[in-house]
Amino acid sequence: MSKIDKASRRQKIKDRSRFSVAGTQEKPRLCVYRSLSQIYAQLIDDSGKKTIMAVSSMSKENKELKGSKTEVCHRVGKQIAEKALANGITNVVFDRNGFRYHGRIKALADGAREAGLIF
């Protein structure tokens, strides 16, 4: 599968799932983006069109993280969950953004669930 096919496949899945995945103020959307070496997670309120909070593997508290990419993703998932719980958010809608639920995406989701987020 060529790189163009992978990108267009992910975009189609992302567009298709956007109809069923929407966040509100009470239950925001946990949107995940995975680049080649980094991971980004955001809590988004789609009704107000605002990002509530964001954590990435490049943020200041994560600069010194050691370990594999999967372990770093697990820690990022725990951090976004801890921030959400501190703001009173317990339920979220998980948006994998067209990526397969496998590897680093799954590690982030598992970390968020372990820290107490419900989805």
Swiss-Prot record:
Keyword annotations of the record: Ribonucleoprotein, Ribosomal protein, RNA-binding, rRNA-binding
GO term, biological process aspect, one: translation
Example of a GO MF term: structural constituent of ribosome
Record flagged with keyword Cell membrane: no
Pfam family, one: Ribosomal_L18p
Taxonomy, superkingdom: Bacteria
GO-annotated cellular components: cytosolic large ribosomal subunit
HAMAP family named in the record: Ribosomal_uL18_B
PANTHER family (UniProt xref): 39S RIBOSOMAL PROTEIN L18, MITOCHONDRIAL, LARGE RIBOSOMAL SUBUNIT PROTEIN UL18M
The family this protein is said to belong to: Belongs to the universal ribosomal protein uL18 family.
Self-association state and partner proteins as the record states: Part of the 50S ribosomal subunit; part of the 5S rRNA/L5/L18/L25 subcomplex. Contacts the 5S and 23S rRNAs.
Role description: This is one of the proteins that bind and probably mediate the attachment of the 5S RNA into the large ribosomal subunit, where it forms part of the central protuberance.
Name of this protein: Large ribosomal subunit protein uL18
Gene that encodes it: rplR
